[in-house]
Design a protein with these regions (language model features):
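Phosphate- and divalent-cation-binding pockets in alpha/beta enzyme and binding domains
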Residues: 112, 154-158, 270-274
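Ferredoxin-type iron-sulfur electron-transfer modules in oxidoreductases and energy-metabolism complexes
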Residues: 1-11, 242-249, 281-286
Length: 286
């Protein structure tokens, strides 16, 4: 439980599982009103997904670390990584605006969702943190949250098991309607396990892609709902070697079907992109 306690302490101190300059999380936003009843909620996932690999290296030493504060100034996303994350979030924001969706953004006060506590099984810590975030949203008068990644979406929905969370949670996919492809040809989609198997979003983004002008390449073992592989990302804090092995296998499976591999999750991108060029949904459509 040392790791869970350390993560929870960091959430209380920094508002994130590990120390980070909050400007990294917020600098993507341009001309979005601050706050409001409906917000776009990033949980700083796209902005920091690449750092999960770095911080996972320190997990075995959690018992010896009283704090990760010393790492804050040493570890940050590369310019290439952060520029890409910002472009994706800006593309998502622009797609929503073009469809008449009105929303605000919490900027530096945006809290992290607590997803890592949930996914590592620290349910007591997650329950306590969920209450803190729920109270924060109530104080801000937030009634609807637009999510941009599956881990955050799942965490928010699980709040209801632990606290009086009554905010409407919707994925940005569900608000897009028709989209147009930015590219031509064939693509293969790597499904997020959460979106596909637990949250019922698989056909939402797949139908958008199908109607956008690209051709989805399918395989009954590689891309079907019940047979497709995980990217390996969620297990990285527990078993880094196994996580990377799974990612290599998955990348090989996907690129045999198409060179154009598309993901719908920043963590999937972070884990698979070591082994093949990966595109995000919001880089493929507009």
């Amino acid at each position: 439980m040392v790791l869970g306690k350390l993560i929870f302490q960091n959430l209380q101190k920094f508002g994130f599982p590990y120390p980070i300059d909050k400007s990294v999380c917020t600098s993507w936003a341009k001309d979005i009103p601050k706050g409001g009843e409906t917000i776009i909620y990033t949980s700083c996932m796209y902005q920091t997904a690449s750092l999960s690999d770095i911080f996972s290296k320190f997990i075995p030493y959690a018992e010896k670390l009283s704090s990760l504060s010393a790492l804050a100034k040493l570890v940050k996303p590369s310019k290439e990584e952060i520029d890409r994350a910002y472009r994706i979030l800006q593309n998502i924001s622009l797609m929503l605006k073009r469809r008449g969706v009105q929303f605000g953004y919490l900027y530096e006060s945006e809290p992290y969702s607590g997803a890592i506590l949930l996914e590592l099984g620290y349910l007591d810590e997650f329950a306590e943190y969920a209450k803190i975030v729920t109270d924060f949203f109530k104080q801000k008068g937030i009634k609807r949250i637009i999510t941009v990644d599956p881990h955050t979406h799942n965490a928010l929905l699980r709040y209801k098991e632990f606290t009086n969370f009554d905010v409407d949670v919707v994925s940005y996919f569900e608000l897009l309607g028709n989209v147009k492809a930015r590219m031509q040809g064939e693509i293969v989609v790597h499904d997020s396990c959460l979106y596909s198997r637990f949250l019922g979003k698989r056909e939402v983004y797949r139908s958008l892609l199908n109607s956008s002008g690209v051709k989805l390449v399918e395989d009954e073992l590689v891309t079907e709902k019940d047979t497709s592989y995980c990217c390996g990302g969620p297990i990285k804090p527990v078993n880094r070697e196994l996580s990377e092995k799974i990612a290599r296998i998955r990348a090989e499976q996907l690129k045999r079907l198409s060179e154009n591999v598309v993901v719908v999750c920043p963590m999937c991108y972070a884990n698979l992109s070591k082994y093949h060029k990966i595109l995000d949904f919001a880089e493929v459509v507009e």
